[in-house]
């Protein structure tokens, strides 16, 4: 079965408070991770929460990268979803873990849009 994309869901633990709470730094790291993986960036949106935390998304031609941080816990939840086979989501994920200084990471990959033959042939949507 072929998949339309690969989605890596990562949990980053033991990251520094200051980096996870700095919206500009988080944005820079996320953008660089997309570029390091060979993605083409389309849009970038990040938000700083009060008293702490950052959420953001980097929309790429191949799909997206998203992050939500809990600086007080040294934790970041990361999604890297890529379509096609030109961008490896693990390249971006590993870059993020390194740049956020994660002491521990758990991650799993899910295939998205796995096309079951009977549905792949149909172009109509019947719900």
Swiss-Prot record:
Give the UniProt entry's GO cellular component terms: cytosol
**In the record, what terms sit under GO molecular function?**
adenosylmethionine decarboxylase activity
EC class of this enzyme? lyase
User: How does the record describe the protein's post-translational processing?
Assistant: Is synthesized initially as an inactive proenzyme. Formation of the active enzyme involves a self-maturation process in which the active site pyruvoyl group is generated from an internal serine residue via an autocatalytic post-translational modification. Two non-identical subunits are generated from the proenzyme in this reaction, and the pyruvate is formed at the N-terminus of the alpha chain, which is derived from the carboxyl end of the proenzyme.
What Pfam families does UniProt report for this protein, alphabetically? AdoMet_dc
Per the record, the pathway is:
Amine and polyamine biosynthesis; S-adenosylmethioninamine biosynthesis; S-adenosylmethioninamine from S-adenosyl-L-methionine: step 1/1
Listed as disulfide-bonded, the cysteine pairs are: none
Q: How is the cofactor bound?
A: Binds 1 pyruvoyl group covalently per subunit.
InterPro entries named in the record = AdoMetDC_C, AdoMetDC_fam_prok, AdoMetDC_N, S-AdoMet_deCO2ase_core, S-AdoMet_deCOase_pro-enz
Q: Which reaction does it catalyse?
A: S-adenosyl-L-methionine + H(+) = S-adenosyl 3-(methylsulfanyl)propylamine + CO2
The yes or no answer to whether the keyword Iron-sulfur is present is no
- GO terms for biological process? spermidine biosynthetic process
Q: Which residues form the active site?
A: 63 (schiff-base intermediate with substrate), 68 (proton acceptor), 83 (proton donor)
Q: What does this protein do?
A: Catalyzes the decarboxylation of S-adenosylmethionine to S-adenosylmethioninamine (dcAdoMet), the propylamine donor required for the synthesis of the polyamines spermine and spermidine from the diamine putrescine.
Instruction: Please report the name of this protein according to its UniProt entry.
Output: S-adenosylmethionine decarboxylase proenzyme
Q: Which organism is it from?
A: Carboxydothermus hydrogenoformans (strain ATCC BAA-161 / DSM 6008 / Z-2901)
Q: Which gene encodes it?
A: speH
